[in-house]
């Protein structure tokens, strides 16, 4: 009797440890799943959807102040500039000699009380345009025009040469293109042969399927049922495809539950046998 009690005690501890391991496995998976779900929810709450609030410049800084000369003080001075040495013509010395004899400009301004309207008249020197009085200046002014005409002629010649050089390659490409068409036709012939070859290869497969069709009545033809189920899965019947894995998962869960119940019942029986 003592030996039986000792063995029962040993078995009791073994079953208890085994049950604890199984429970720890299931509890760990459950806890991990719950923890992962809580982390995902917290991440979703901490990262809200960023709206479209862009920092835009609301203040439009515009020049609203219109500074206008509203003063009524007008300048009536008639200061005229005598002929400067740096003239527009080619002979600045002639400008300097002619300028003292005639004044350049004389301005007269009349101002009203409100200074809103002002009229000015100016008399210019008729001899101010030195390019017209100086024949030498005309010759020097015309030289740049001749240079521009020469450059334009050169550019026109270059454009003509470019257009001539661009024309022949297009004609050559057009003349060569008909020769490439027979080569493409020759290349298309082996492609047609390749397309015919798969039909010949598919013929024995059709024969094999016909033979399998005659063998459905035999008893030893169980693997074909699995192939039929696979065909249904490939056809798109999701119900048939999901049936097998769902049954397997349920059976595994049921087996684990049965083992757990058996171990608990065994430990209870041994505990009663030991202490009673």
From Swiss-Prot:
Membrane topology, as annotated: Lipid-anchor; GPI-anchor
Record flagged with keyword Oxidoreductase: no
InterPro entries, A to Z: MSA2
Organism: Plasmodium falciparum (isolate 7G8)
Compositionally biased tracts (Gly residues): 51-90
UniProt protein name: Merozoite surface protein 2
Top-level lineage group: Eukaryota
Residue span of region 5 X 6 AA tandem repeats of G-G-S-G-S-A: 53-82
A Pfam family it matches: MSA_2
Low complexity bias locations: 91-127
Known glycosylation sites: 22, 36, 153, 225, 250
Residue ranges crossing the lipid bilayer per the database entry: none
């Amino acid at each position: 009797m003592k030996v039986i009690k000792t063995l029962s005690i040993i078995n009791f501890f073994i079953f208890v440890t085994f049950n604890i391991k199984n429970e720890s496995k299931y509890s760990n998976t459950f806890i991990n799943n719950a923890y992962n779900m809580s982390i995902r929810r917290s991440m979703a709450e901490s990262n809200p959807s960023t709206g479209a609030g862009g920092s835009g410049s609301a203040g439009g800084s515009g020049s609203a102040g219109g500074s206008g000369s509203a003063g009524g003080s007008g300048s009536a001075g008639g200061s005229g500039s005598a002929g400067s040495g740096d003239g527009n013509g080619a002979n600045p010395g002639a400008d300097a000699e002619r300028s003292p004899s005639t004044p350049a400009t004389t301005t007269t301004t009349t101002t009203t009380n409100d200074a809103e309207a002002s009229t000015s008249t100016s008399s210019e020197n008729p001899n101010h345009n030195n390019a017209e009085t100086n024949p030498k200046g005309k010759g020097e002014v015309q030289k740049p025009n001749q240079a521009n005409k020469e450059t334009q002629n050169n550019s026109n010649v270059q454009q003509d040469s470019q257009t001539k050089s661009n024309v022949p390659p297009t004609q050559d490409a057009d003349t060569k293109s008909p020769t490439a068409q027979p080569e493409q036709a020759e290349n298309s012939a082996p492609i047609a042969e390749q397309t015919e070859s798969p039909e010949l290869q598919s013929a024995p497969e059709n024969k094999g399927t016909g033979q399998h069709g005659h063998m459905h009545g035999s008893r030893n033809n169980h693997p074909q049922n699995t192939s039929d189920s696979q065909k249904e899965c490939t056809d798109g019947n999701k119900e048939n495809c999901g049936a097998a894995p769902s049954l397997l998962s349920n059976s595994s869960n049921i087996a684990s539950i049965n083992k757990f119940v058996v171990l608990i019942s065994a430990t209870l029986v041994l505990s009663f046998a030991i202490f009673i």
